[in-house]
Amino acid sequence: MLQTKNYKFWFCTGSQDLYGDECLAKVAQHSKQIVDELNKTGILPYELVWKPTLITNELIRKTFNEANADEECAGVITWMHTFSPAKSWILGLQEYRKPLMHFHTQFNEEIPYDSIDMDFMNENQSAHGDREYGHIVSRMRIERKVVVGHWSDSVVVGKIASWMRTAVGIMESSHIRVMRVADNMRNVAVTEGDKVEAQIKFGWEVDAYPVNEIAESVAAVSASDTNALVDEYYDKYEILLEGRDPEEFKKHVAVQAQIELGFERFLEEKNYQAIVTHFGDLGALKQLPGLAIQRLMEKGYGFGAEGDWKVAAMVRLMKIMTAGMKDAKGTSMLEDYTYNLVKGKEGILQAHMLEICPTIAEGPISIKCQPLSMGDREDPTRLVFTAKEGHGIATSLIDLGNRFRLIINDVECKKTEKDMPKLPVATAFWTPEPDLYTGAEAWILAGGAHHTAFSYDLTAEQMGDWASAMGIEAVYIDKDTKIRDFKRDLMLGEVFYR
């Protein structure tokens, strides 16, 4: 389900014909070597493709338009090896519509003190060539990422790799389609939002379907398919009967297996990559989807509870951005539930009624069947686990009425002090940066929701870059946050983002 296009990124080097064929040949040789070496590092998540040196207005414009037309091109990385008069770039930049990086580097790492002469100076002019180019991009108010450093530095390569994932998120955002099989929870404000504006800003298509239409897809799943999936569950997860009759327990598990298969087939048939449900609108469904939704999230689908389509789209987006990542720790919807306010042990218990993605799990994953007061249906089965320790980010996309705001909080996930044997749901426990009190105050001042799209594998910088590309405000809550400054930033955002 996380399959995307076989994306590539173009590496475009700027120069001009003033320097002659010998110099331009070296420019091409150097840029090819940089591309080859970057691809060999194994750090980049996508292939970098070398393009011939751009030396004229016509060639620049042609190359950028070819990048626009190439469905596999997810972005262009530009670098000025020599001086490249920036007026030559205006038309190409005006017509370019994909993510852009300005890589401010140079071929040589060190000044060749003993041999440097004017030929070398003319050939290696990134220090001022990139400033000329940077000026025109800034003057044109074009959003781009700037990465500075030598191309052989693994830290610098890591920054390029990180941006590539953001760029793919930017590209894939316009392909996200969210299926609403339930409306927003009655009287809840923060999960509401302008779906038309979301499609204009982010490219998201958010559509409603009657819950009984997807329930028919569930009912159409054969007993043999359902039983095969139940067998898979029993092989993969621990089964915690907790005194329930084994056959009765298995029937409850089978309901979720049937929901998983029916939902997935319906989503694939209708071409949707995210879904929202609501315990108050279950139609003919026998249980609130729990284990089924958890499994769909694990496959890469986005999910939002109680009609929260913004979280569903954000979870899908963040799963796309982390696709194929080595040693990924996971991405999920989470919800702020309750605090631990004991001094020195502060934190927020994260959970939901059922639907937390098992990609964030550490240790055993169990199936439990417990009553649920909401929904007025059978006791639903769900996967129960505790989340990994480590650093992550919690994001909340909110609608302020006239615009969107993305709130990004760095958090530290920890082990809970004690087990919670009577709590039959998956949980995480984190302390927001810079501390619980400042983090929670800033979150509330910014208008953040109780539902979040959370990931161990993305950074605040990556999500902020995505927000900038979408033309919306991003506010950061991190180790440096001070409430007085944060409130000032919110006031400035009100003026700038209109």
How should each PLM-predicted stretch be described?
Residues 45-47, 104, 109-244:
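Cap/lid and interdomain-hinge subdomains that line or gate substrate/regulatory clefts
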